Amino acid sequence: MKVNGVEVEETFAEAFDIKIARVLITGYDYYWAWVAANEATGFGTSVIMCPAEAGIEIKAKPSETPDGRPGYYIQICHMSKKGLEEQLLARLGQCVLTAPTTAVFNGLPDAEEKFDTGFKLKFFADGYEKEVEVGGRKCWAVPMMEGDFIIENDIGYTNGIAGGNFFIMAETQPSALAAAKAAVDAISDVEGVITPFPGGIVASGSKVGANKYKFLKASTNEKFAPSIRDQVEGTQIPEGVKAVYEIVINGLNADAIKEATRVGILAATKIPGVVKITAGNYGGKLGKHIINLNELF
């Protein structure tokens, strides 16, 4: 199959279950909302070594937020309920409570499952906290140096999906990078998904476990490493490909990940020098969710 003249391999991405909390952070303007969102989602690329996977999802217009201010939705992802609650409390407490002009609201108001994160963080007020209503939501006002920090009592979470992916293969590193950035930019407009790696792009595509070093949880995916193409039996690098980037997508549901994959591939294949698009799957070792690339177009 070809998209914009570029071969898209008839294969699938293999994704896995994860729990996702969705948070709305608002601020005085988009800059300060972004600062807090960016801090709160740091060190969140992969559960292989990070305490959570996290990323900025999408902008929120002032007309869409409980306090009428601009904001960003973020997602924090963890394999366990306990771990997710701990990460939510730590990241909101250390990275958003501390940031200028921010407020925090539940990004999944209809979720059946919630954490009382706002209730817990209100104790920072040391007895001066006050229950308030903002946009019809139960919140807490925490007096601080700049004024009151507002946080909603509950933050919702859901069973989501992590590890949706596709690979961009190109003739040069600059063309691969330009295509990957174009893909991430397109995906940033899709509601319900994040691309948790640096700039949304994975340079170090990995496989589950390792062939030589058995103590590793993950190791380089040598079949996708152009510099050792001639040394690797079963290499997946076509002739003429000098660089590969992977886009990893987490989302609230499969439909959101599929749409993000679709628009990402459409954007990437418009960049000159892109040779092929494929995806990563691991023989069922990683997860049960299958995203067939050929079904997206």
Curated annotation (Swiss-Prot):
Fetch the Gene3D superfamilies from UniProt: 3.30.70.520
Q: Does the keyword Transferase apply?
A: yes
Q: Which principal EC class is assigned to this enzyme?
A: transferase
Q: Which EC number(s) does UniProt give?
A: 2.3.1.101
One GO MF annotation is: formylmethanofuran-tetrahydromethanopterin N-formyltransferase activity
What superkingdom does the record give? Archaea
Q: Which Pfam families match?
A: FTR, FTR_C
Catalysed reaction per UniProt? N-formylmethanofuran + 5,6,7,8-tetrahydromethanopterin + H(+) = N(5)-formyl-5,6,7,8-tetrahydromethanopterin + methanofuran
A GO cellular component annotation here is: cytoplasm
Compartment(s): Cytoplasm
Biological function: Catalyzes the transfer of a formyl group from 5-formyl tetrahydromethanopterin (5-formyl-H(4)MPT) to methanofuran (MFR) to produce formylmethanofuran (formyl-MFR) and tetrahydromethanopterin (H(4)MPT).
Q: Which family does it belong to?
A: Belongs to the FTR family.
Q: What is this protein called?
A: Formylmethanofuran--tetrahydromethanopterin formyltransferase
Gene name linked to the record: ftr
